[in-house]
């Protein structure tokens, strides 16, 4: 497991949701990575520890992406969607996360 000593309560709050999109499925098939939306203050060590704790898999590496919110018009006012932080998690060979089986 990971050398990062974090309490389990914090790790349960790091992963917000898996990202299910066309790009995420292509990345999952091609590079054997899983994409998660994570907390804005999470770092790579916390994401790695959280994935290993929740899904009982071994993580090879984590890449973090900060996606800025788009500018949108709301009536006559300009607004902005929320910023999103995503984590691309590479699993070690032979490891996989199946969200369909986990949900049952």
UniProtKB/Swiss-Prot annotation:
Entry keywords, A to Z: Ribonucleoprotein, Ribosomal protein, RNA-binding, rRNA-binding
Top-level lineage group: Bacteria
Bridged cysteine pairs (disulfide): none
A Gene Ontology BP annotation from the UniProt entry: translation
GO CC annotation terms, alphabetical: ribonucleoprotein complex; ribosome
Pfam families: Ribosomal_L23
Any GO molecular function: rRNA binding
Family: Belongs to the universal ribosomal protein uL23 family.
Complex and partners: Part of the 50S ribosomal subunit. Contacts protein L29, and trigger factor when it is bound to the ribosome.
Job of this protein: One of the early assembly proteins it binds 23S rRNA. One of the proteins that surrounds the polypeptide exit tunnel on the outside of the ribosome. Forms the main docking site for trigger factor binding to the ribosome.
Name of the protein in its database record: Large ribosomal subunit protein uL23
Gene giving rise to this polypeptide: rplW
